[in-house]
């Protein structure tokens, strides 16, 4: 059975969403393990804030890159479908 562009695109979108959700869940678990701020020294509080910001930024960048790759794969898949169509039905 041949895969349509819509099926391929939907599957990539679903995988992107699932991966993003899992990353957010992992981050939430990590952030939940943070000690109570009232017990932290100012230096450690600053350290945790920087680390959390870094994790959020890297997660955002990674998800953006994953989305870009998915869009690239969708484009390539569409091109392959066009090539296949042109090979099956060459114009006279």
UniProtKB/Swiss-Prot annotation:
Subunit structure: Monomer.
GO cellular component: cytoplasm; microtubule; microtubule cytoskeleton; motile cilium
Gene for this chain: KMP-11C
Biological-process GO terms, alphabetical: cytoskeleton organization; defense response; positive regulation of cell population proliferation
Pfam families with a match to the protein in the record: KMP11
Alphabetized UniProt keyword annotations: Calcium, Cell projection, Cilium, Cytoplasm, Cytoskeleton, Flagellum, Microtubule
UniProt-annotated location(s): Cytoplasm, Cytoskeleton; Cell projection, Cilium, Flagellum
Identification of the protein by name: Kinetoplastid membrane protein 11C
């Amino acid at each position: 059975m041949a895969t349509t562009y819509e099926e391929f695109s939907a599957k990539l979108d679903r995988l992107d969403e699932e991966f993003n959700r899992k990353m957010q869940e992992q981050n939430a678990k990590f952030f939940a393990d943070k000690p109570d701020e009232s017990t932290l020294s100012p230096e450690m509080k600053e350290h945790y804030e920087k680390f959390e910001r870094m994790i959020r930024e890297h997660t955002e960048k990674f998800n953006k890159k994953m989305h870009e790759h998915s869009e690239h794969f969708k484009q390539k898949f569409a091109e392959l479908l066009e090539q296949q169509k042109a090979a099956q039905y060459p114009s006279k």
